[in-house]
């Protein structure tokens, strides 16, 4: 079981605080000037697929060593063992945390409550494979005898963000003749606009809800069912066009779905980690089951690296402790994930959920309020779009924003010199953020342009870049199912490590519940014309204004 250790009370934390104070004026430029081989010392490569360069960070060898010592002191090794062995480390829900078992391609036994879960995991995978084969071969036909051409995944949170992100990232691997669509928002616009794009005769809906009671998902599912029956006019045809990713067989059957087309998963699979489970069916249908298996395999490879590698060379651990350094010692409040690959445009949003839902906690594993920072704000957009939007603040603003830059060495679309131009920006941005531009350089540039110092004195301060902004550069040989699996697992395990260090429970999400409870109480009040007075004056005023306007 996870130990309950307040990180701020450890020896390593105290030593890191001393090091932070002693290195208050540390400059990335000085670190490189003092060590021309810094890149070699502060980069790691994984299986010729990923290169992680963390040399452009505000860390010395001594700081790095103490950060790893912090991981040792909070018993990260024991926590890793507890995760992979099926211990119930999700204590508040009394559950194991075993998304790693879903991608356990070595098929070694994994036990929960004395039962090896791998036979059930493999059975669901085989069922998914058979289902994909039927759809892709045209054997599965709609109510008019036509083959399926469109998949509509109806879910929310992990049942939507993950599958959408992966199918977008792996669009070059899309099965010909199959288009995927994703509906999540309970705003009727989302389902209406999606249904306008598809044909009821050739569309297969996947309803992704473990309990089959999720409000947003079931509202959209019933609207899709009603839309479908407006054309099909026979409820028995629902079974030809709907499948379920759920464990509630009774509710699935009542909806009209054949329970043989219900794909189950387990309570030890968290929603934000569920792409590795039956929730990944939309991925498998979109990119092909063989490619889905390669995705699983890539994640398993990173899991093995994480489980077996010493901390000094362990990529998720390294990224995690660097994040702790900025979050808890430098006072950084956010981290940016910046993929230089258009297919990866939803990757930052996916790990916005993955990180903030996991580590956005203010209570430690002892049930006490923490007096230190936990999870950071995660955000980002693809490059180079972000360069023309928010990079200004990262370069010259007043906030420290550590950034992860991600780019593939090889493009799926090698058009002209597009990729060289993209990568030139990828390389240039981390260099600019680290080293900046001095006043002397700015003055020399103006002089070369024939300007006198007097003419441009008012401009010079605005053109100086202080630099010293930390980044990690993650170079991928190519975005493939394998490397994407590795990247996702890398970030997942980074999040786990940080949760262990911060002494919080990373696998519950009670913060999601309160708003849902209150919405359930408010909904009946919206069905009457009467003014409400049962809330605070702000909420009453908003509800009553809505009633007057609707």
Swiss-Prot record:
Subcellular location: Cytoplasm
Active site: 357, 388, 516
One Pfam family here: PGI
Cellular component, GO annotation: cytosol
EC number(s) given by UniProt: 5.3.1.9
SUPFAM superfamilies tied to this protein: SIS domain
GO BP terms in the entry: gluconeogenesis; glucose 6-phosphate metabolic process; glycolytic process
Entry keyword annotation includes Isomerase: yes
Entry's Gene Ontology molecular function annotations: carbohydrate derivative binding; glucose-6-phosphate isomerase activity; monosaccharide binding
Keyword Iron: no
Biochemical pathway: Carbohydrate biosynthesis; gluconeogenesis; Carbohydrate degradation; glycolysis; D-glyceraldehyde 3-phosphate and glycerone phosphate from D-glucose: step 2/4
Catalytic reaction list: alpha-D-glucose 6-phosphate = beta-D-fructose 6-phosphate
Xref: InterPro entries: G6P_Isomerase, G6P_Isomerase_C, Phosphoglucose_isomerase_CS, SIS_dom_sf, SIS_PGI_1, SIS_PGI_2
Keywords noted in UniProt: Cytoplasm, Gluconeogenesis, Glycolysis, Isomerase
Enzyme class, broadest EC rank: isomerase
Protein purpose: Catalyzes the reversible isomerization of glucose-6-phosphate to fructose-6-phosphate.
Family, similarity comment: Belongs to the GPI family.
Protein name as annotated: Glucose-6-phosphate isomerase
